[in-house]
Amino acid sequence: IDAAIESKFVGYHDLTHDSKVTVLTTADALVDELKEGMEGTILVEETPFYATMGGQVADTGVIRTANAEFVVEDTIKLQGTKIGHVGKMTKGSIKVGETVTLAVDEARRNLIANNHSATHLMQKALRMVLGNHVEQAGSLVDPDKLRFDFTHFSPMTPEEIAKVEEIVNQEIQNGLDVVTNEMTIDEAKKTGAMALFGEKYGDTVRVVQMGDFSSELCGGTHVKNTSNISAFKIVSESGVAAGVRRIEALTGAGLIAHFNQVEETLKEAAALLKVSPADVVKRITALQEEVKTL
């Protein structure tokens, strides 16, 4: 691919955008046209699609013209400044030089944004509860959940987990506006914005601020207001390496689905024990006592 070809990301504000096709490829060759049924990668001048980066998964969606449709299954960074839309032509054909409409799956993007913004709130809450030694050691943000690895020397207690949840949910309820600003790395450091330990940053960085509560250097996509996240719950906390802990957590729609699943399991257990859900623990305790006397 020509080194002079670049792709500009315009997806912080626009989820639908018209742009010109600059490159088409199949798995093994550059082509002038992708036809129906073909799998390949499309590059354009400007795209609203976010490529996998900084722990945040890629956008999916469609690229279309009046007569053609390409389903985007993945978005990847190529040769630094190029963004490739990987997928399959499901209708018609698209040629190099054609103007296409790129449309990100908005519902999915919003779920990812909920989880990414919740990660920022949680990192601040972890530092408040556990101490300033907490540093991000890894992160995954997808539509279903968030996973966060951080430096800490021991398992979190139930009380510490509950306190982190309480702080995050309070800031969600507080409805903090999420504001992003671009500035030099020196300016960002002066504002006290949190940076990733060991990360190499360019001259200009993006600072994501959530009210007066959280400020971090981040290139990801976020909610406009913390109230969009709805609710937050930590579902697991475990060790992944010496001095590194991992949290998995859910927000919004993912959390409701989790609660529904847990409730269904509880109802099934209650039915098997022939008691109400509220009496499940009491019945299991009684059965354990019976077993001891056998």
Residue spans of the language-model regions?
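A glycine- and charged-residue-rich anion-binding loop/surface
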Residues: 1-294
